[in-house]
Amino acid sequence: MQDGTVANQLAGRLRLAAACLLAWMAAAAVFCVQAQPVTESSVKAAFLYKFTGFVDWPQGTFERSNDVLVIGVLGSDAVASDLEQMVAGRNVDGHPLGVRRPREGDTLRGLHVLFIAAEREARVRDLVQSTPGPVLVVTEQDAGLRLGAVLNFVNDGGKVRFTASLNAAEARGLRLSARLLAVAQSVEGHAR
Protein backbone atom coordinates (compact mmCIF):
# COMPACT_ATOMS: atom_id res chain seq x y z
CA MET A 1 0.00 0.00 0.00
CA GLN A 2 2.89 2.25 0.68
CA ASP A 3 4.08 1.74 -2.90
CA GLY A 4 0.71 3.08 -4.14
CA THR A 5 1.10 6.20 -2.01
CA VAL A 6 4.60 6.86 -3.33
CA ALA A 7 3.35 6.32 -6.87
CA ASN A 8 0.45 8.71 -6.25
CA GLN A 9 2.80 11.32 -4.80
CA LEU A 10 5.15 10.98 -7.76
CA ALA A 11 2.26 11.24 -10.21
CA GLY A 12 1.00 14.37 -8.41
CA ARG A 13 4.44 15.98 -8.57
CA LEU A 14 4.73 15.16 -12.26
CA ARG A 15 1.31 16.72 -12.92
CA LEU A 16 2.33 19.82 -10.96
CA ALA A 17 5.63 20.08 -12.84
CA ALA A 18 3.82 19.65 -16.17
CA ALA A 19 1.27 22.31 -15.22
CA CYS A 20 4.06 24.72 -14.20
CA LEU A 21 5.91 24.04 -17.45
CA LEU A 22 2.75 24.68 -19.48
CA ALA A 23 2.06 27.89 -17.56
CA TRP A 24 5.64 29.06 -18.12
CA MET A 25 5.43 28.24 -21.85
CA ALA A 26 2.13 30.08 -22.18
CA ALA A 27 3.55 33.14 -20.42
CA ALA A 28 6.66 33.05 -22.63
CA ALA A 29 4.52 32.77 -25.77
CA VAL A 30 2.37 35.74 -24.76
CA PHE A 31 5.49 37.77 -24.00
CA CYS A 32 7.08 36.91 -27.37
CA VAL A 33 3.94 37.51 -29.44
CA GLN A 34 3.04 40.91 -28.01
CA ALA A 35 2.52 43.49 -30.75
CA GLN A 36 5.14 46.09 -31.45
CA PRO A 37 4.44 49.32 -29.60
CA VAL A 38 2.82 52.11 -31.60
CA THR A 39 5.45 54.73 -32.33
CA GLU A 40 5.13 58.29 -33.56
CA SER A 41 6.84 57.29 -36.80
CA SER A 42 4.35 54.47 -37.42
CA VAL A 43 1.41 56.82 -36.79
CA LYS A 44 2.83 59.37 -39.25
CA ALA A 45 3.46 56.60 -41.78
CA ALA A 46 -0.16 55.46 -41.41
CA PHE A 47 -1.40 59.01 -41.94
CA LEU A 48 0.78 59.43 -45.05
CA TYR A 49 -0.59 56.19 -46.47
CA LYS A 50 -4.20 57.11 -45.68
CA PHE A 51 -3.86 60.68 -47.01
CA THR A 52 -3.36 59.27 -50.52
CA GLY A 53 -6.92 57.97 -50.57
CA PHE A 54 -8.42 61.36 -49.73
CA VAL A 55 -6.70 63.57 -52.30
CA ASP A 56 -7.71 64.13 -55.92
CA TRP A 57 -4.76 64.87 -58.19
CA PRO A 58 -5.43 66.89 -61.36
CA GLN A 59 -6.04 65.21 -64.72
CA GLY A 60 -2.74 64.30 -66.35
CA THR A 61 -0.81 63.79 -63.11
CA PHE A 62 -0.54 60.11 -63.95
CA GLU A 63 0.24 59.08 -67.53
CA ARG A 64 -1.41 55.67 -67.07
CA SER A 65 -4.12 54.48 -64.73
CA ASN A 66 -1.71 52.02 -63.09
CA ASP A 67 1.29 54.36 -62.62
CA VAL A 68 2.93 54.17 -59.21
CA LEU A 69 1.83 56.79 -56.68
CA VAL A 70 5.16 57.81 -55.12
CA ILE A 71 5.47 59.01 -51.53
CA GLY A 72 8.78 60.72 -50.77
CA VAL A 73 10.06 60.79 -47.20
CA LEU A 74 12.81 63.31 -46.54
CA GLY A 75 14.68 63.30 -43.25
CA SER A 76 13.10 60.40 -41.35
CA ASP A 77 14.33 56.87 -41.97
CA ALA A 78 11.95 55.60 -39.26
CA VAL A 79 8.87 56.98 -41.04
CA ALA A 80 10.18 55.74 -44.41
CA SER A 81 10.78 52.22 -43.06
CA ASP A 82 7.36 52.03 -41.41
CA LEU A 83 5.72 53.37 -44.57
CA GLU A 84 7.54 50.89 -46.83
CA GLN A 85 6.20 48.00 -44.75
CA MET A 86 2.72 49.50 -44.65
CA VAL A 87 2.29 50.12 -48.39
CA ALA A 88 3.95 46.97 -49.72
CA GLY A 89 1.56 45.43 -52.24
CA ARG A 90 -1.13 48.08 -51.71
CA ASN A 91 -2.93 50.27 -54.24
CA VAL A 92 -4.91 53.49 -54.09
CA ASP A 93 -7.40 54.05 -56.91
CA GLY A 94 -5.56 51.47 -59.01
CA HIS A 95 -2.15 53.03 -58.41
CA PRO A 96 0.43 50.84 -56.68
CA LEU A 97 2.14 52.72 -53.85
CA GLY A 98 5.88 53.27 -53.70
CA VAL A 99 8.22 55.01 -51.26
CA ARG A 100 11.31 57.04 -52.15
CA ARG A 101 13.91 58.43 -49.76
CA PRO A 102 15.35 61.47 -51.52
CA ARG A 103 18.73 62.64 -50.24
CA GLU A 104 20.34 66.08 -50.36
CA GLY A 105 20.61 67.14 -53.99
CA ASP A 106 18.21 64.49 -55.36
CA THR A 107 15.44 65.64 -57.65
CA LEU A 108 12.00 65.74 -56.11
CA ARG A 109 10.29 65.32 -59.47
CA GLY A 110 8.04 62.31 -59.84
CA LEU A 111 6.72 62.50 -56.28
CA HIS A 112 3.01 62.72 -55.56
CA VAL A 113 3.41 63.12 -51.80
CA LEU A 114 6.43 64.63 -50.04
CA PHE A 115 6.85 64.36 -46.28
CA ILE A 116 9.50 66.74 -44.95
CA ALA A 117 10.55 65.69 -41.45
CA ALA A 118 11.53 68.34 -38.90
CA GLU A 119 13.93 70.77 -40.53
CA ARG A 120 14.91 74.37 -40.05
CA GLU A 121 12.22 76.78 -41.21
CA ALA A 122 14.34 78.18 -44.07
CA ARG A 123 15.12 74.65 -45.32
CA VAL A 124 11.42 73.69 -45.29
CA ARG A 125 10.57 76.84 -47.27
CA ASP A 126 13.26 76.01 -49.86
CA LEU A 127 12.06 72.40 -50.17
CA VAL A 128 8.41 73.43 -50.54
CA GLN A 129 9.31 75.99 -53.21
CA SER A 130 11.49 73.49 -55.08
CA THR A 131 8.61 71.01 -55.28
CA PRO A 132 6.24 72.56 -57.82
CA GLY A 133 3.09 71.10 -59.22
CA PRO A 134 0.53 68.68 -57.86
CA VAL A 135 2.50 67.35 -54.89
CA LEU A 136 0.85 66.84 -51.51
CA VAL A 137 3.50 68.45 -49.29
CA VAL A 138 3.31 67.34 -45.65
CA THR A 139 5.52 68.84 -42.94
CA GLU A 140 5.94 68.66 -39.18
CA GLN A 141 7.11 72.22 -38.68
CA ASP A 142 5.30 74.69 -36.41
CA ALA A 143 5.07 77.09 -39.35
CA GLY A 144 4.49 74.35 -41.94
CA LEU A 145 1.29 75.70 -43.44
CA ARG A 146 2.65 79.25 -43.52
CA LEU A 147 5.68 77.90 -45.41
CA GLY A 148 3.44 76.38 -48.10
CA ALA A 149 2.69 72.85 -46.90
CA VAL A 150 -0.73 71.43 -47.70
CA LEU A 151 -0.84 69.31 -44.52
CA ASN A 152 1.20 69.65 -41.34
CA PHE A 153 1.59 67.21 -38.45
CA VAL A 154 1.12 68.65 -34.97
CA ASN A 155 1.42 67.17 -31.50
CA ASP A 156 -1.85 67.52 -29.61
CA GLY A 157 -1.41 66.31 -26.04
CA GLY A 158 0.87 63.46 -27.08
CA LYS A 159 -1.27 62.50 -30.09
CA VAL A 160 -0.29 63.04 -33.71
CA ARG A 161 -2.84 65.20 -35.51
CA PHE A 162 -2.67 67.32 -38.63
CA THR A 163 -3.72 70.72 -39.92
CA ALA A 164 -4.64 71.55 -43.51
CA SER A 165 -4.34 74.51 -45.88
CA LEU A 166 -6.99 74.73 -48.59
CA ASN A 167 -5.12 77.60 -50.25
CA ALA A 168 -1.91 75.55 -50.55
CA ALA A 169 -3.88 72.58 -51.89
CA GLU A 170 -5.60 74.76 -54.49
CA ALA A 171 -2.30 76.38 -55.51
CA ARG A 172 -0.95 72.88 -56.23
CA GLY A 173 -4.06 71.79 -58.11
CA LEU A 174 -5.04 69.29 -55.40
CA ARG A 175 -8.52 68.69 -54.03
CA LEU A 176 -8.75 67.51 -50.43
CA SER A 177 -11.70 65.31 -49.53
CA ALA A 178 -14.28 66.67 -47.11
CA ARG A 179 -13.78 63.48 -45.09
CA LEU A 180 -10.07 64.31 -44.71
CA LEU A 181 -10.82 67.90 -43.71
CA ALA A 182 -13.40 66.71 -41.16
CA VAL A 183 -10.70 64.96 -39.12
CA ALA A 184 -8.10 67.73 -39.40
CA GLN A 185 -7.35 69.59 -36.19
CA SER A 186 -7.82 72.84 -38.11
CA VAL A 187 -8.32 73.95 -41.70
CA GLU A 188 -6.92 77.23 -43.01
CA GLY A 189 -8.10 79.08 -46.09
CA HIS A 190 -11.23 78.53 -48.07
CA ALA A 191 -12.34 76.53 -51.06
CA ARG A 192 -13.16 78.59 -54.12
Region annotations inferred by a language model:
Residues 2-21, 26-192:
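Short hydrophobic alpha-helices and adjacent helix-cap/hinge residues
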